[in-house]
């Protein structure tokens, strides 16, 4: 199927030109047969589109001392808009032998290369007359013949446009073959669709998501709750595994900031020398029950939210949000950035820990349910959830024994940081999805993340294995003075929110976000969410979206559906400058590479005993 994934040659000359060029390069080729189709749905001037190549190839063959004949038929009428006579004339003027029918064209082609063909004598049979009983046509048939038809057009839109021009009522159905027509993937999908137990396993995975009860338990220094980081020089990073030398510049900049924060070096030069020496160990956050925004850089003394999934008993961790602009997660490492981190370590973290402990923990589901009804999608818009969180902790903070300056600074920071809840949402989603992936079967996506070079996903049935592909650069809106040339390829563990069903998956909950990320308006938000529902298997009844006819958020990205439908999850994201130190320069959306999902389903099918 050399036209797989491409328009038919009667529509687009590209593949036909490629085949002609290949044929002329073959010294055994003496004649090339062509058929030119006229009419609606065909190229507006296929003869004219092919002639430059035909003339070039004829000359190429002549220069090589060879003779290559071009023989063609033109299938159409003088009423076709391309013009039958015009097409024939163009071909003949270019030295093409034009025949009236395919039979004559084949005979001409054979004779052109010095061969002959004797057509066998066909048996003449007596015509048998069929006797058919005359039937009265039905009312529906008469309507079809006497009225303009109502048409559902599948595939090429130009057919629908022609019917509309004639006044027909037309519905355009956009269809494409499963998995883009890839036979290997179609066989894999058929196997996984029919394999007993996968659908039930997927339902068990999402049932765990719905049943989860995440609770913010503490804010602790990372080394107190993450054993892998407690000793030595260890830095956690976002995304699948990556070496320091391969990290994009903003992530390396974040590492410099972490080294300065931990006081492993006194200046940038010494920090970079330390990082390049190999003395610092790098581990993906996901390998430590943690997640991190953007670069994801987490070191021993950074305060992290501790979110416990009370249903399954597991915990997840995430650093606190620093605010916007020049911040560590976007690659900045100035003195201002490092001093803010120290304040978060010494004041903000301990204050929130005391408040949350006094409250006996803070259940997250009610905060999310409340905020989604107030217009948050929990990746680019978190203002309602951030204020709801502050509403819970602020009264307790006012009673804590602490300096008035520190008290004011903490509450002011919470009030000013619209995105503060994002990191809580990330830890929440991680705790929930880690609990759900204790079901070790099925095709539900349990993690999505990126490190600035690779995008990685996990699915329930393949445990801890990463399936990766080259990361994309976000498309969106840039701050004044910046454009796409300044953007860094996508990075961060924050796509765990989309894995959970919010963020870009819940765009309709926050239509205002579509403008901020350059994705349009309300209709675009609705379209995106409806499209995301096509690749998930259910809706989460815990988080109802009023602007989506009170449907729940998307629940359970099925890797099979992603590959089958050719739809990848949409992820809302910030955009870092490609050079460390500039910080955030915009916001937009990004999609994972389809390659990740294809690899995942092929590997899972293989695990179950199938080889495509």
Give the role of each language-model region:
Residues 97-105:
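Short acidic-hydrophobic, aromatic-tinged amphipathic segments that line or gate anion-handling sites
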């Amino acid at each position: 199927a050399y036209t797989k994934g491409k328009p038919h040659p009667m529509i687009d000359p590209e593949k036909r030109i490629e085949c002609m060029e290949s044929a002329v390069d073959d010294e055994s080729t003496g004649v090339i047969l062509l058929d030119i189709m006229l009419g609606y749905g065909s190229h507006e001037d296929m003869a004219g589109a092919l002639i430059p190549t035909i003339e070039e190839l004829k000359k190429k063959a002549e220069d090589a001392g060879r003779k290559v004949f071009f023989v063609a038929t033109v299938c159409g009428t003088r009423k076709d808009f391309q013009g039958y006579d015009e097409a024939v004339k163009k071909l003949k003027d270019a030295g093409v032998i034009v025949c009236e029918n395919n039979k004559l064209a084949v005979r001409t082609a054979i004779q052109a290369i010095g061969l002959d063909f004797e057509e066998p004598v066909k048996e003449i049979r007596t015509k048998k007359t069929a006797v058919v009983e005359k039937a009265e046509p039905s009312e529906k048939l008469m309507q079809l013949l006497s009225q303009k038809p109502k048409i559902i057009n599948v595939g090429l839109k130009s057919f629908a446009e022609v019917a509309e021009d004639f006044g027909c009522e037309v519905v355009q159905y956009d269809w494409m073959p499963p998995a883009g027509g890839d036979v290997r993937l179609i066989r894999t999908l058929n196997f996984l669709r029919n394999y007993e137990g996968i659908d039930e396993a997927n339902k068990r995975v999402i049932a765990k998501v719905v049943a989860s009860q995440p609770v913010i338990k503490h804010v602790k220094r990372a080394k107190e709750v993450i054993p892998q980081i407690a000793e030595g020089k260890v830095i956690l990073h976002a995304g699948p595994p990556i070496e320091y030398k391969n990290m994009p510049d903003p992530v390396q900049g974040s590492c410099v900031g972490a080294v300065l924060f931990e006081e492993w070096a006194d200046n940038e030069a010494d920090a970079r020398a330390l990082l390049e020496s190999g003395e610092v160990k790098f581990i993906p956050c996901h390998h430590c029950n943690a997640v991190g925004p953007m670069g994801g850089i987490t070191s021993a003394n950074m305060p992290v939210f501790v979110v416990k999934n009370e249903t399954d008993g597991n915990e997840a961790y995430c650093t606190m949000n620093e605010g916007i602009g020049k911040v560590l997660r976007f690659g900045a490492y100035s003195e201002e950035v490092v001093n803010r981190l120290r304040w978060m370590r010494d004041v903000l973290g301990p204050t929130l820990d005391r408040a949350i402990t006094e409250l006996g923990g803070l259940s997250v589901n009610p905060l999310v349910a409340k905020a989604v009804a107030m217009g948050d999608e929990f990746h680019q818009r978190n203002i309602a959830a951030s204020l709801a969180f502050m509403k819970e902790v602020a009264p307790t903070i006012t009673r804590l024994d602490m300096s008035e300056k520190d008290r004011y600074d903490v509450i002011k920071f919470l009030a000013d940081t619209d995105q503060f809840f994002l990191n809580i949402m990330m830890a929440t989603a991680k705790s929930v999805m880690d609990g759900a992936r204790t079901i070790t079967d099925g095709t539900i996506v349990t993690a999505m993340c990126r490190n600035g070079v690779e995008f990685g996903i996990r699915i329930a049935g393949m445990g801890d294995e990463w399936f990766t592909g080259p990361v994309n650069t976000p498309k969106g809106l840039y701050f004044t003075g910046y454009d796409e040339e300044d953007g860094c390829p996508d990075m961060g563990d924050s796509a765990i929110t989309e894995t959970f069903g919010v963020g870009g998956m819940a765009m309709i909950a926050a239509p205002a976000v579509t403008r901020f990320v350059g994705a349009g308006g309300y209709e675009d938000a609705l379209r995106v969410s409806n499209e995301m529902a096509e690749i998930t298997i259910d809706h989460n009844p815990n988080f109802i979206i009023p602007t989506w006819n009170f449907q729940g958020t998307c629940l359970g990205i099925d890797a099979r559906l992603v590959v089958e439908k050719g739809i990848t999850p949409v992820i809302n994201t910030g955009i870092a400058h490609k050079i460390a130190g500039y910080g955030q320069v915009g916001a937009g959306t990004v999609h994972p590479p389809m390659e990740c999902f294809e690899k995942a389903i092929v590997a899972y099918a293989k695990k179950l005993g199938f080889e495509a």
